[in-house]
Amino acid sequence: MKHIAVSGLKLEYRDFPATAEGRPTLLLLHEGLGCVTMWRHFPEKLAAATGCRLIVWSRAGYGGSEAYAEPRTPRYMHREAEEMLPALIAALGIARPLLIGHSDGGTIALIFAGAFPEAPLGVAVMAPHEFVEDVTLAGIRDARVVWKTTDMAQKLARCHHAQTERVFLDWNDTW
């Protein structure tokens, strides 16, 4: 796994080079408990199928990426979209990426596109947060019970290592 310095933090990422000329760079944005490794083989398969350069990274505090020193706020997705994502794109030297985001990553992609409409080539999102439904909040409350009563922490630790508890509680407490 590679690492890159972005806004004073070391972020892990994988970079799949383009295999065809003139293709955009795809940038994958993970969900609320995700990271590079949780995408499994999808990035590699998508890069091969499209011929595009594809970059997938773990946001600050996820996977093998360094965490923010300060606690998460309810505006964490705005911070990612308006500060960290532009800094990452600049650090990687990407011009007009095509953003592909799932859940939190989809919301971050949409916020980024709204804040910087000329920056992305396009945005594709899966299950972004446009509004919060009661059923979503109930599911997140249920996830806390699963966290406390099953091996969920051990399973997440395969990807988030020593940061696992913070990753889960930041996600769960924010909602």
Model regions and ranges:
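N-terminal cap/lid segment of alpha/beta-hydrolase-fold proteins
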Residues: M1-K10
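Conserved HGGG/HGGXW glycine-rich cap/lid loop of the alpha/beta-hydrolase fold
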Residues: L9-Y68
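Active-site micro-motifs of SAM-dependent methyltransferase domains
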Residues: G34, G61, G106, E130-F131
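A conserved amphipathic alpha-helix that caps or lines the catalytic cleft of carbohydrate-
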Residues: P43, I89, F112-A113
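Active-site loop/oxyanion-hole signature of alpha/beta-hydrolase fold enzymes
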Residues: T50, V56-L98
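Conserved alpha/beta-hydrolase "nucleophile elbow" surrounding the catalytic nucleophile
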Residues: P97, G101-G106
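Flexible "cap/lid" loop of the alpha/beta hydrolase fold
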Residues: T107-M152
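The alpha/beta-hydrolase serine catalytic core
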Residues: A138-W175
